[in-house]
Amino acid sequence: MAHKKAGGSSRNGRDSESKRLGVKKFGGEVVIPGNIIVRQRGTQWHPGANVGMGKDHTIFALTTGNVTYRTKSNGRVFVSVMPKTAEAAE
């Protein structure tokens, strides 16, 4: 015969895995082609010069250079890669 009442089971304890979204390379950081700069849902950041955008809106570098962020007058933030000059590379 049981001497303790059976405990109820909790119906909580489920959650989805985090998607690790956000900025991966900040302004001034050096990137090489293929480096992911921003992972996002939708276009919180927009692609500028020397960057591409994947089908999931991921912004990635197309050339080697420094990452820059620029806000236009309409409030949109554009991510660009400023290529390294020949003198700076030597």
Swiss-Prot record:
Biological processes, Gene Ontology terms: translation
GO molecular-function term, one example from the UniProt record: structural constituent of ribosome
UniProt keyword terms in alphabetical order: Ribonucleoprotein, Ribosomal protein
InterPro entries on file: Ribosomal_bL27 (IPR001684), Ribosomal_bL27_CS (IPR018261)
Keyword Ribonucleoprotein belongs to the record: yes
Gene Ontology cellular-component annotations: cytosolic large ribosomal subunit
Keyword Ribonucleoprotein: yes
Name used for this protein in its record: Large ribosomal subunit protein bL27
Organism (species): Allorhizobium ampelinum (strain ATCC BAA-846 / DSM 112012 / S4)
